[in-house]
Design a protein with these regions (language model features):
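Conserved acidic/glycine
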Residues: 1-141, 151
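Conserved thiamine diphosphate
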Residues: 137-177
């Protein structure tokens, strides 16, 4: 098959050989990246120590120092009160508490926000006209939702969460593998 593709494309280069024209263009793009990185670093270095430290914490996938304490308080509250509520309501209560503490937390739901309680009072909708939000309305797209969350988690610096009902989980499975 490889030979047929080479023949069809009239590809005269050896395996793993990059044509000079392509290599030259690729290196130009790399040089642009170096310039952009220098600009970004100049802006970043002007930020306050607090902002820089918070950014570095987030991008290195570390939780805030007091985060476990916050979770312990929530667990104790549920253990002591033993509320008679649906699991999605107890989950919403926890999400409500941690959303304000973790700027790297981005939530969303596949058209079920009101039912599965994934949207909090701290949630701001992420949309094409405003990328500063922390909540995504995926629409009826469980497969896309799971794939997007996997991509965010893989990139790092973002902790995604989402919600759907168990009956719709089969739509997510290809993206969850």
């Amino acid at each position: 098959e490889v030979d047929l593709v080479r023949k069809k494309l009239k590809w005269k280069y050896k395996p793993f050989e990059v044509p000079k024209e392509i290599l030259s263009e690729w290196r130009k793009i790399g040089e642009q990246g170096i310039v952009q990185e220098k600009k970004w670093n100049a802006v970043f270095n002007k930020k306050s120590k607090k902002i820089k430290d918070e950014f570095l914490r987030i991008i290195s996938n570390k939780l805030p120092n007091d985060f476990n304490k916050l979770l312990e308080v929530q667990k104790k509250k549920f253990f002591d009160l033993k509320p008679d509520i649906a699991s999605r309501q107890s989950s919403a209560s926890i999400i409500e508490e941690i959303t304000n503490s973790l700027p790297e937390l981005i939530g969303g739901s596949a058209d079920l926000s009101g039912s599965n309680n994934t949207k909090t009072k701290h949630s701001k909708i992420l949309k094409p006209s405003n990328f500063s939000g922390n909540y995504i309305h995926y629409g009826v797209r469980e497969h896309a939702m799971a794939g997007i969350m996997n991509g965010m988690a893989l990139h790092g610096g973002i902790i995604p969460y989402g919600g759907t009902f168990l009956i719709f989980l089969d739509y997510c499975k290809p993206s969850l593998r």
